[in-house]
Each structure stands twice: as structure tokens, then as C-alpha cells.
Amino acid sequence: MSFALGLTGSIGMGKSTTAAMFRDLDVPVWDADATVHKLYARGGAAVAPIDALVPGAMKDGAIDRAVLRAAIADDASLLKQIEAIVHPLVAKDRAMFRDIHSTAPLIILDIPLLFETGGDAACDATLVVTTSPEEQRRRVLARGTSEDTLHDLLSRQMPDAEKRARATYVIETDTLDGTRQDVAHLVSKLTEGT
């Protein structure tokens, strides 16, 4: 069975860029966000059950995330019900990924809320990517996100310091070259002797 490294980091910390660096080194990467998007897309396994729970959430055969967010804002109890639909489907997709890549020496499980959802229990080790609060803010605002939205997103995530304290490995993502070197070093370390 492959060594599973859970990858996480708060918004703007460089998680997607780091995941791409693992892919560039031919390490299979499973992306929780992409899986949820697939489940919400036309023909996705979550579409019908969510539409039954939140009438009108389906538009053109797919889940309209804005409608879903508005429904959750109106009735917070919906979130747990939606999670009860989505989480088992995500776990099934992750298990299929692990089966497909069972002979790979290393796989990455890219899970934004790794610690918050208990996803770290499915991992052999965890990696948190981090940068300074100033750089994080600069990156997120450069995407067109407002200060208020950034504050709201961060308030719903585990603080970076706590993530770093819980992580097996931490990579500072201040520079692309430094991050690339750290990723390559970690891949070598975790695949030595395989």
C-alpha cells in the first residue's frame, strides 16, 4: 500500500501550487475540492440527493453552489445534512484513488480542511504549507477576494499555528524555488528504499 501524505494549508498558503509540484514529480495527487466539484457537476452522484434536500439547488443538471450557500445561510442545519450526503461519496472516491495507485510508493491526499474534518486519520503523515500572514493576505487579495471574505474564510479554518503544530512536516512557500526544493527533498525522504 502507498504511503499517504495528507496535504493542507489555509487559503493563500500555496497548497495548490505545492500539489502541482508533487504532480510534476509523478506523485499521484487526490484533490478533495475537485472531487466535490465532480460530485456537484451534471451527472454527479450528489446532484439528485442534494436537489431532493434543497429544492431548486439543481440548475441545468448540476448543483448551483450559490443557491446551496444561500440555503445554508438561511438554515444552518442543512450543512450537516449535505455533509451526510457528500462525505461518504468523497470517501468512496478517495478509496478508489488509493486502490488505483496502491503500487505507488507515495500518494498525496490534498484536503483543504484536513484536520478540521478528521481527514488526517486516513494519512500516514501530514504536510502543512505555510507563509507569513502578510504574504497570505497579498496572495488572496490578488485573486480578487475582499478583506471581509478573507476574514470570513479564515474564521472558519483552524489557525495556521495550530495546523503547523499538528503537522508531521511543514513547508514554507515563500518562494517557488525554495518550495520546489523542499517538495523534492520530502519526496526523496518518503520514497527512500522503495
Swiss-Prot record:
GO cellular component terms, semicolon-separated: cytoplasm
Role summary: Catalyzes the phosphorylation of the 3'-hydroxyl group of dephosphocoenzyme A to form coenzyme A.
E.C. no: 2.7.1.24
Subcellular location, record wording: Cytoplasm
Lineage: Bacteria, Pseudomonadati, Pseudomonadota, Alphaproteobacteria, Rhodobacterales
Protein family according to the UniProt entry: Belongs to the CoaE family.
GO molecular function, one term: dephospho-CoA kinase activity
Lineage top rank: taxon: Bacteria
Residues binding ATP: 12-17
Pathway where it operates: Cofactor biosynthesis; coenzyme A biosynthesis; CoA from (R)-pantothenate: step 5/5
Gene3D superfamilies, per the entry: P-loop containing nucleotide triphosphate hydrolases
Reaction catalysed by this enzyme: 3'-dephospho-CoA + ATP = ADP + CoA + H(+)
Disulfide-bond pairs as recorded: none
Protein name listed in UniProt: Dephospho-CoA kinase
Keywords: ATP-binding, Coenzyme A biosynthesis, Cytoplasm, Kinase, Nucleotide-binding, Transferase
Gene Ontology biological process: coenzyme A biosynthetic process
Alphabetized Pfam families for the sequence: CoaE
Main location: cytoplasm
Occurrences of domain DPCK (ranges): 4-194
